[in-house]
Design a protein with these regions (language model features):
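C-terminal structural segments of small proteins and small subunits
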Residues: 49-75
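A short, structured beta-strand/loop element
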Residues: 23-59
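N-terminal first-folded block
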Residues: 1-27, 35-38
Length: 75
């Protein structure tokens, strides 16, 4: 398994949008995204930081139910 890279929030959001996530709002330095999966709605918060910490990105991927390899292909 690869190591989680250090990326900017714009790169992360761009990849998540390719996976079907939609930006619903931004408040301050936090961006909210959501995705409808079946009969449930998943929500994420991505901090608008450059770069986003690798541990934070790891938690975002867990919440998004995305594996690192698939995420890296979306970049």
């Amino acid at each position: 398994m690869s190591h989680v890279p250090s990326l900017s929030y714009r790169e992360i959001i761009h990849a998540l949008q390719h996976d079907g996530w939609i930006v619903i709002r931004q408040r301050g330095s936090y961006i909210r995204l959501q995705k409808h999966v079946g009969n449930r709605t998943m929500k994420l918060t991505v901090p608008a930081h450059r770069p986003v910490k690798r541990s934070t990105l790891s938690q975002i991927l867990k919440q998004a139910e995305l594996e690192l390899n698939k995420f890296l292909k979306l970049l």
